[in-house]
């Protein structure tokens, strides 16, 4: 543990590290290898493994650690309704294709994605029940409701307009898989996958995640060309969009957590007429970008003009 924390400190010198542990580990911390080093590198956040593990139990050990290791940072908590499972039991369940009920979806997804704890899933042939948590593991926490909302909106739109519901769900789950990356990381992916960029895209971070996300979706998850294109065009749109591309563009635009002037009217129009909804969404985007003094991508202009005839 001390070696791991030392490495993490070198990799993340500006971050504050905390080591989470249950009651049994907390009560024996002084017997670990290099406890003083551990406590100098990270704070300790200990939680009760059962409801019987009260503050009274924690306080004696906490006071001892403070006396013995003055530099220690310790936070203890009790969790109502806690379920008792050991890390050993959880690892065993994961190796047997179980364990998901004990973990936050994004955490479970990260374990599957990185093949940790003897999990051996084929990322290119995941059922939706596993693709969803893996997709969520790519996101910042605050973006998770948006992606889940986009999936649900994509289902409704696909059912309404006869697009492939399964493909709409996959595209929705993966459409923002590279959204959290910075410009340097986005450009590195573009270089890796041979993605050619125009002058606007080279400067507009918001536009890049659609293309790099499509590349990751195809390379890592093995999506087909229809899903690839739906992710590729979900930010700008383009002339002659397929039904799936339209569904993806609009699901991203009007999903339930979106809240901006005109969104309710746009939602109404989208379910009255798909093309009218798409045209309205494109025009709203163009108006917003123009009002902000930002350039509008030519693909968006071409998509609008094609719909207007």
Name these PLM-found stretches.
Residues 89-93, 250, 288:
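Solvent-exposed, amphipathic alpha-helical segments
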Residues 129, 139:
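N-terminal polybasic phosphate/anion-binding patch
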Residues 133-137, 146, 155-282:
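Divalent metal-dependent catalytic cores for phosphoryl transfer on phosphate-bearing substrates
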Residues 264-309:
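Metal-dependent nucleotide-binding catalytic modules
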């Amino acid at each position: 543990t001390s070696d791991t924390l030392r490495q993490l400190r070198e990799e993340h010198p500006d971050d504050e590290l905390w080591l989470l542990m249950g009651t049994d580990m907390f009560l024996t911390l002084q017997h670990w290898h290099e406890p003083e080093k551990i406590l100098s590198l990270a704070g300790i956040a200990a939680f009760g493994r059962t409801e019987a593990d009260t503050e009274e139990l924690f306080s004696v050990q906490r006071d001892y650690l403070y006396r013995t290791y003055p530099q220690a940072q310790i936070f203890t908590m009790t969790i109502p309704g806690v379920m008792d499972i050991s890390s050993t039991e959880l690892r065993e369940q994961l190796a047997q294709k179980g364990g998901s009920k004990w973990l936050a979806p994004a955490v479970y997804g990260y374990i599957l994605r990185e093949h940790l704890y003897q999990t051996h899933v084929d990322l290119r042939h995941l059922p939706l029940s596993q693709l969803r948590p893996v997709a969520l593991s790519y996101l910042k926490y605050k973006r998770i409701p948006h992606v889940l909302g986009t999936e649900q909106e994509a289902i409704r739109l696909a059912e309404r307009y006869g697009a492939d519901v399964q493909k709409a769900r996959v595209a929705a789950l993966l459409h923002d898989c590279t959204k959290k990356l910075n410009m340097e990381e986005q450009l590195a992916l573009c270089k890796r996958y041979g993605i050619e960029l125009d002058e606007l895209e080279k400067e507009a971070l918001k536009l890049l995640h659609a293309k790099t996300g499509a590349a990751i979706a195809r390379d890592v998850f093995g999506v087909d060309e229809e899903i690839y294109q739906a992710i590729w065009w979900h930010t700008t749109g383009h002339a002659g969009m397929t039904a799936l591309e339209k569904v993806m563009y609009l699901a991203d635009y009007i999903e339930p957590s979106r809240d901006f002037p005109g969104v309710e009217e746009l939602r109404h129009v989208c379910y009255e007429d798909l093309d009218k909804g798409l045209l309205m969404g494109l025009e709203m985007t163009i108006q917003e970008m123009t009002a902000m003094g930002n350039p509008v991508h030519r693909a968006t202009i071409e998509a609008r003009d094609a719909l207007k005839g």
